[in-house]
Structure formats: structure tokens, C-alpha cells
Amino acid sequence: MALRFEILHQSKKSRARVGRIETAHGYIDTPAFVPVATNGALKGVLDHSNIPLMFCNTYHLIVHPGAEAIAAMGGLHQFIGRNAPIITDSGGFQIFSLAYGSVAEEIKSCGKKKGGNTIIKVNDDGVHFKSYRDGRKLFLSPEISVQAQKDLGADIILPLDELLPFHADPTYFHQSSQRTYVWEKRSLDYHLKNPGIQSMYGVIHGGTFPDQRKLGCKFVEDLPFDGSAIGGSLGKNLQDIVEVVGVTAANLSAERPRHLLGIGDLPSIWATVGFGIDSFDSSYPTKAARHGMILTSQGPLKINNQRYSSDLNPIEPGCSCLACSQGITRAYLRHLFKVHEPNAGIWASIHNMHHMQKVMREIREGILNDRI
């Protein structure tokens, strides 16, 4: 079955809404945070059964072990032991972000090109690139990307698109936008030949230009996509993100779920959920955890600071996550980080993921009570 989306409550205070997405592998209560499991695994988190939707990267899974190999083993759900919804990207995001950086990295660096030259050529057919693992030459077209995602068997899939950095040349930006929408139409056409249980979101580009964002919305709205994903360059800071998301969401129909690609840190979620965004994906909680940044109700906690060296409080008093409930103290966690124990990142990741799910429950409650 393709997904079904139901709006359960529309806030009286904003465009925020509480909804439910139904897929063949279960329900997703929205707004939802969607952690990124790059290679089919959430770094430092062993149990993902309580995570409603997980984001896996097609590019990395194509490179190893291969989409066909995963299909032969029963698909991605069977391969990673997950009986809950999965979303996969097209592979394009990873290819271009390896060259230009991710959306989050772009905001920090204003889109300075990264050192690795993995892209060989981009044309209307698709993108030629080198494997980041062994340097072998690979090719990704809209049809190849969608077939790979069908082999993986994710519940929600995305069309191939080109991710451009904030500093892209205006002429090339226009060419890229036109090519991206051709790729998306080809992706959708290929998907609709055999949709099965999968659903496809259309990706809206347009950079920081309101008129281009509106054109992107019209393109996606005019085609039978199952949902909308706000992608592409979102600017250089949170203010830009808010402006881009606000304009884009205002030009989308309420009937389809809306996903914000590559943005899922707490300040951005709080700043944009009022526009009616239904899901946010990011590797932020686990990446922050591996660097000793602990998410708490009182704000981020830098566990490596000397002040926690003899702090015998739980990571966060009152927290019910596995780390806190097992008595992992701030002093002990700091010690684990200082001696480079792998357990440090694991405990921190478990806590951070639990915190994100807690925040999303609070957000849904706030919308239901018309406070957000």
C-alpha cells in the first residue's frame, strides 16, 4: 500500500498540525524527527524499534553491499532487522554533498567546495561519479536510482535531484533546476510503473529565491507525488532557513505530508514546525553525541568540561532513557570520553535520541493544545 496521511489536528495558533502517516510497515505520528542511518545503522544506537521513521542513504548502500545484494536478502527491512517505516534518498544528495558539503555544513561554511573530487560529470542523463570507498567509476540516472530504492524496499523514496551549494553560479543554478525537475519526472514515471507498497515524495528546489521556490512547489503539486520534501540550498543561517521554509510551505497543499530534508537540529525544528512541517531528518543528535554534546531540557551540555569531572548526577535528572535509568553519571560519561572509550558515544547517542523523541512528543502535545 502507498502511504495514507491524515491530519488529526490543525493548530489555531499557526500552520502547525498533528498528523499520522500510515505505511505498510507501520504508523508515523507527526511532526516526527527522522534520524539518519547512513549505512543502515544509527551510529551508537543499537535499538531503533521505538523510532517511528528512519532515513537510510541509498548512495552508501549502493556502494556497499549493493542494492541488488540487499534485495536478494529480502530487502532493507529484513537486512537490518527493522519492522517499521524507512525512507531512502535518491543517492544524489550524498554524491553532491561529498563534493560541496551537506545542507548543515553549507550553512556553516557558506558552501565552500570540499576537497574530494568525487563527481566526474553531470549531464541530462545523470551523474557520473567515483566511489568514495575504492575510486571505481559509477553512474546514477533517475531510473537507476529509483530501481535501487525499489531493491532496498523503503516505504518512502525520493527522486534523483541535484544539490547545489549556496554560492552556485546563477546561470548554472537555472540549468540545474531545470535538469532536476526533468530527473524528478523521470523518477516518478519509473516509480509509477510498479509502485508496490512504496510512496514517492517530490523534492522542491529553488534556493533562497521565493519565485523559484513557488515554481518548485507548482511542479511538485501538479504531479501525483505522495508527499513533498523541501530540499536544495536553504541559505546560510537559521533566518534564511525560516524564510525559505515559510515561503515554500505556504505554497503546498495541506493534504500531502511535508518533509524538511537535512535539517533536524532543535533550533531549526522549533523555528519551522509552525509552518506545517511534518518530518525532519538529520544526523545531528548522534553526531553531537559522538563529540560530547549532550541534549537536555536545559539546553546542550558539553560533557567534556571540567565542571562535570566529579558530577555524580545522572546525565539528565528525571530522564528515562537507558543511559540515565542505568545510572550513568555525568562524571563517568566524561571519563569515558576522556579515555576514548567507544561506550562514551554509545551512551551519549542513546540519551540524545531519547531526548529528540521526547521533544517531538512535547511538540505534538503543544500543537494539540494550540500552544504552537
Swiss-Prot record:
Give UniProt keywords alphabetically.
Answer: Glycosyltransferase, Metal-binding, Queuosine biosynthesis, Transferase, tRNA processing, Zinc
**Which co-factor is required?**
Zn(2+)
Binding-site residues, Zn(2+): C319, C321, C324, H351
Which reaction does this enzyme catalyse, per its entry? Answer: 7-aminomethyl-7-carbaguanine + guanosine(34) in tRNA = 7-aminomethyl-7-carbaguanosine(34) in tRNA + guanine
According to its UniProt entry, the protein's GO biological process terms are: queuosine biosynthetic process; tRNA-guanine transglycosylation
Cofactor remark from the record = Binds 1 zinc ion per subunit.
Could you cite one Gene Ontology molecular function of this protein? tRNA-guanosine(34) queuine transglycosylase activity
Presence of the UniProt keyword Metal-binding in the record? yes
Task: Give the family from UniProt.
Answer: Belongs to the queuine tRNA-ribosyltransferase family.
Cite the record's note on assembly: Homodimer. Within each dimer, one monomer is responsible for RNA recognition and catalysis, while the other monomer binds to the replacement base PreQ1.
According to UniProt, the name of this protein is Queuine tRNA-ribosyltransferase
Source organism per UniProt = Chlamydia trachomatis serovar D (strain ATCC VR-885 / DSM 19411 / UW-3/Cx)
Gene field = tgt
